[in-house]
């Protein structure tokens, strides 16, 4: 009998930056990948050519979330993991309706993973003890709060709390953990002054790049014991 085909890993927000790096990491390991994307960046075409299943999704409404879930539920054998990487960033700015800012942040960071975890639960179960994973990507600000991004920080804190609740609900078949990154990589338009200020906020004074995230994700996927925990990736920033 031949070796069973690996189950796919679902990555939300896989069209760019960390999500894209994770997708390519798994593809290079011959691991099937399902990627959600909102905007069709050129990188999506590369993923499709490499064999990834890429599904355009609108997580700004619950109907959009459930439509995406319905597509994923067509997977006949199940899922190896769900990596909740999709994110948005909004600040409380003059002229921006505060209720809209809060609703947007809660929709993408709370409603979306909450609904997907429930809708896709049966795809994660039935594969054995600690055989499946959910990883939530939260943020360093969960620990400290943010006076400029209050709604964002609150929504990521809610996601952090859901990590422990889903860990209780889904154990021992499914492990549920979160990763709380600070500065991982810069945007192309970030100028030298901003970059230096950002680097000085941590003890390690570097932007480690996607590999630091990939290594931690690999650890969590291979562990058969760790669940219900949040793992900071902040370079010692909490000690500054």
From Swiss-Prot:
GO terms for molecular function: dihydrofolate reductase activity. Its EC number is 1.5.1.50, 1.5.1.3. Keywords: NADP, One-carbon metabolism, Oxidoreductase. It holds the Pfam family adh_short_C2. It is an enzyme of class 1 (oxidoreductase). It catalyses: (6S)-5,6,7,8-tetrahydrofolate + NADP(+) = 7,8-dihydrofolate + NADPH + H(+); 7,8-dihydromonapterin + NADPH + H(+) = 5,6,7,8-tetrahydromonapterin + NADP(+). It comes from the Bacteria. The active site is at residue 152. GO terms for biological process: one-carbon metabolic process. Belongs to the short-chain dehydrogenases/reductases (SDR) family. FolM subfamily. Catalyzes the reduction of dihydromonapterin to tetrahydromonapterin. Also has lower activity with dihydrofolate. This is Dihydromonapterin reductase. It comes from Shigella sonnei (strain Ss046). The gene is folM.
């Amino acid at each position: 009998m031949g070796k069973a085909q690996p189950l796919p890993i679902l990555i939300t927000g896989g069209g760019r930056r960390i999500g894209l790096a994770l997708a390519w990491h798994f593809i290079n390991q011959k691991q099937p990948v399902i990627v959600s994307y909102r905007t069709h960046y050129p990188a999506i075409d590369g993923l499709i050519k490499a064999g990834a299943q890429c599904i355009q999704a609108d997580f700004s409404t619950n109907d959009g979330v459930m439509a995406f879930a319905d597509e994923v539920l067509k997977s006949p054998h199940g899922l190896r993991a769900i990596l909740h990487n999709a994110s948005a960033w909004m600040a409380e700015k003059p002229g921006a309706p505060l209720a809209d800012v809060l609703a947007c942040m809660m929709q993408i960071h709370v409603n979306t993973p909450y609904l997907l975890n429930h809708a896709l639960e049966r795809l994660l179960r039935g594969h054995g003890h600690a055989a499946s994973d959910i990883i939530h990507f939260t943020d360093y600000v969960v620990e400290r709060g943010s006076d400029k991004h209050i709604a964002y920080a609150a929504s990521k804190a809610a996601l952090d709390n859901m990590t422990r609740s889903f860990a209780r609900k889904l154990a021992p078949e499914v492990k549920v953990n979160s990763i709380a990154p600070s500065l991982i990589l810069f945007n192309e338009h970030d100028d030298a002054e901003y970059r230096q200020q950002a680097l000085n906020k941590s003890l390690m004074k570097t932007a480690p790049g996607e590999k630091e995230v990939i290594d931690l994700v690999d650890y969590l996927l291979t562990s058969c014991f760790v669940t219900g925990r949040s793992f900071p990736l902040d370079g010692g920033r909490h000690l500054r």
